[in-house]
Amino acid sequence: MNWIKLLPVAIAGVVLCGCTSILNEEAILNEEAPASSHSEPSVINDRQIVQQMTSRVTEMMDSDSVVEMKDLIEKLKEEPKAKLQLPEVSQSSADEAQKAVAVVGGVYKCNRCPDWHIAPASGFLIAEDLVVTNYHVVDNPERSGLAVRLFDGRMFMVEDVVASSEQYDLAVLRLPKTGVKPVALGPSAPVGAKVSLISHPNRKFYTLSEGRVARYFVTQRNRKPVPAMAITADFGKGSSGAPVLNEQGQVVGIAASTESLYYTEKEGVQNNLQMVFKNCVPVSQLLELIGG
């Protein structure tokens, strides 16, 4: 099973994680997330989002108020639970749900420039000051901090770990109040139910994919059995922590890992890829973690 951890990669000659020149800040803010209308959807500029995150996180990391990653990981490993009173949220469209999806990423310095960078994964708001992602997104001691970028372009540093479970691969993180409408947590989705997912695979920010619940099964984490959910909607590296949504826009799962099935293996080399399983955390485990 391959956990979706973010590493510097290149596609078609474009370096996806590294130094980039910073565009004019005003131009970035004006172009990164244009206002949508009934006739025109929001247009995502991946390159400008990366550059804006680099610029903003460099400013934030230079302040004295950043909670260091080692402190977040220390709290993470305590595996706190919380009895949370979540706000009542009405049914959400895909466009509304998109605004509650966040980029969640560890902050690091490369060896080619003085700037700070973000290794982006995914997450979503369940309250205006609470974001959910995977445990393994936070558990990276090589990072210096943890940043969150909202759909509207604002960025925050994570202040605290409110709840976490390594076995369930979940973390609930505290932010300053954002004023953003969160997504609702729904009931468990039956096998065959239609689902969608909004995530950031390989820095293709706010990509929507659709599919169905394929099955529920038992997997192993830390040598302990734990229920999991598989879906047919595509996701990949950078999608960890993304919300799996039902047709009412409610969260029914959280993207966690992929597992590739190859037909042959010779001398340790796998060949003839047949299919890829997309494994998720069921929403029931998140509800258990936060006392829902």
Predicted regions and their residues:
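Active-site region of chymotrypsin-like
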Residues: 98-115, 155, 171-182, 207-292
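Active-site substrate-binding loop(s) of clan PA
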Residues: 92-93, 159-162, 174-205
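Catalytic-histidine neighborhood of serine endopeptidases
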Residues: 120, 126-128, 132-168, 175, ...
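Bacterial N-terminal signal peptides that target proteins for export
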Residues: 1-7
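Bacterial signal peptide processing site
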Residues: 20-22
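Bacterial N-terminal signal peptides
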Residues: 8-17
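N-terminal activation segment of mature serine protease catalytic domains
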Residues: 26-124, 289
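Short, surface-exposed secondary-structure boundary micro-motifs
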Residues: 134-136, 200, 257
